[in-house]
């Protein structure tokens, strides 16, 4: 099985726990996830199976969206509800306009400082592990450029603010909550997080682990198994002449005289490569004089 399936991760499980369950249910060893969701978070977690693990990075690089709850007045060291409380402020009062202005600081391209309790690595070690082992002095936090493509408040009830956010790879929603609290001066942390989409996967085409087990046993899982090229539709394509397939599959470079069909642009670096019947993989284009050729970069056959 070389497919992609999107799982609705429940709270209380790590992303690796989900991978382990999928391995056990499907009895397949080669399984990988496409972007860590913290144990306290829930939602969409695409899982790659078999040769589809080669495109984990492609899905990881896609935009993601979340529903999040921010709690004003309480700051924690992890920026979420699992951490130690660093500051508690009770006597604050903000208008909805004040809170809207704070959210406006988290819109568009921004420089974001990640939480020190994160899986980002310093010299091969996760920052959260370094902190927990008393080696925080080895860490120098650096801002990262991220893109908050959409952020909107859904409701404000007391010190709880529910909001929707769509953002680029590498964005920490915990940091958004923390930074809004710092802007307002009362502190804040993330008290709930549900990922609603990851690339082309959302709540509608994702299933629970219980459904995965049931559908697999009943042989009705096919509806939720996606081909590898489903997540590669941002790449243009080339269809090869049948007599070029073997040479291409063995690492040979195929020039455009043996393309049956294509829709690539002159500036494309990679394309999807097909035979007349099957998806073969991703190919890398090269140009020499007036000839364009394609050579295998990732094979999926």
From Swiss-Prot:
Q: Which Pfam families match?
A: TruB_C_2 (PF16198), TruB_N (PF01509)
Q: What enzyme category does the UniProt record give?
A: isomerase
Checking InterPro entries in the record gives:
PsdUridine_synth_cat_dom_sf, PsdUridine_synth_N, tRNA_psdUridine_synth_TruB, TruB_C
| Entry superkingdom | Bacteria
The UniProt record lists the EC number as 5.4.99.25
List the Gene3D superfamilies.
Pseudouridine synthase
Q: Which terms does the UniProt entry file under GO BP? A: mRNA pseudouridine synthesis; tRNA pseudouridine synthesis
Q: Which reaction does it catalyse?
A: uridine(55) in tRNA = pseudouridine(55) in tRNA
Active site feature: 38 (nucleophile)
- Cite the SUPFAM superfamilies for this sequence: Pseudouridine synthase
**What are the entry keywords?**
Isomerase, tRNA processing
**One GO MF term:** RNA binding
Protein purpose: Responsible for synthesis of pseudouridine from uracil-55 in the psi GC loop of transfer RNAs.
Q: Which NCBIfam families has this protein been placed in?
A: TruB
The family line of this record is: Belongs to the pseudouridine synthase TruB family. Type 1 subfamily.
What is the designated name of this protein? tRNA pseudouridine synthase B
């Amino acid at each position: 099985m070389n497919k992609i399936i999107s799982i609705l991760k429940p709270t209380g499980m790590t992303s690796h726990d989900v991978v382990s369950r999928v391995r056990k249910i499907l009895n397949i060893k080669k399984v990988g996830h496409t972007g860590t969701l913290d144990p306290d978070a829930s939602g969409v977690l695409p899982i790659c199976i078999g040769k589809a693990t080669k495109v984990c990075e492609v899905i990881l690089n896609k935009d993601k969206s979340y529903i999040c709850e921010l709690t004003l007045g309480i700051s924690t060291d992890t920026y979420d509800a699992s951490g130690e409380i660093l500051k508690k402020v009770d006597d604050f009062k903000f208008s909805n306009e004040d809170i809207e202005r704070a959210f406006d600081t988290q819109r568009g391209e921004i420089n974001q400082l990640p939480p020190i309790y994160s899986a980002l690595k310093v010299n091969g070690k996760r920052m959260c592990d370094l902190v927990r082992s008393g080696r925080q002095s080895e860490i120098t936090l650096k801002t990262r450029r991220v893109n908050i493509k959409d952020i909107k408040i859904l409701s404000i009830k007391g010190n709880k603010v529910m909001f929707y956010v769509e953002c680029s790879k590498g964005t920490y929603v915990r940091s958004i909550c923390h930074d809004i609290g710092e802007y307002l001066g009362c502190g804040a942390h993330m008290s709930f997080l549900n990922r609603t989409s990851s690339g082309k996967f959302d709540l509608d085409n994702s299933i629970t682990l219980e459904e995965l087990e049931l559908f697999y046993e009943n042989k009705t899982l096919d509806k939720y198994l996606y081909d590898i090229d489903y997540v590669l539709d941002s790449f243009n394509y080339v269809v090869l002449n049948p007599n070029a397939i073997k040479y291409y599959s063995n690492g040979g470079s195929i020039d455009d005289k043996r393309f049956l069909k294509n829709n690539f642009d002159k500036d494309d670096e990679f394309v999807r490569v097909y035979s007349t019947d099957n998806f073969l993989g991703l190919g890398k284009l090269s140009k020499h004089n007036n000839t364009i050729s394609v050579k295998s970069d990732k094979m999926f056959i």
